[in-house]
Regions:
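Conserved C-terminal structural/oligomerization subdomain of aldehyde/semialdehyde dehydrogenase
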Residues: 1-107
């Protein structure tokens, strides 16, 4: 289905059938995008394992869209490069430099 493979924004919910855990992971990852995903289940432990296998920058379990300013925001694949918010965002705005000084040199 086209809605499952394109990155659309809006209030939209796409619901799809799947046969097992491997099938749902395969379908979730079968796109060039990977901004976010949401998993809903009574089995939070299973959701946590599945979340690690989904190629998305953010995965919500039993919620969707809630976040905290200290948690990095960003996607995988064509859904963005880098992260906003949190300590990871500082790397995007920082250029690291190393300066070496020989304090024992007689000049």
């Amino acid at each position: 289905m086209r809605i499952n493979t394109e990155e659309i924004f809006g209030p939209v919910v796409a619901i799809s059938k799947f046969t097992d855990e491997a099938d749902v992971i395969s379908k979730a990852n079968d796109t060039q995008y990977g901004l976010g995903a949401a998993l809903f289940s009574k089995d939070v432990t299973r959701c946590h394992k599945v979340a690690h296998k989904i190629q998305a920058g953010m995965v919500w379990i039993n919620s969707n869209g809630d976040s905290h300013f200290g948690v990095p925001f960003g996607g995988y694949k064509s859904s963005g490069i880098g992260r906003e918010l949190g300590p990871y965002a500082l790397d995007m705005y920082t250029q690291t430099k190393a300066i070496h000084i020989n304090l024992g040199a007689d000049i």
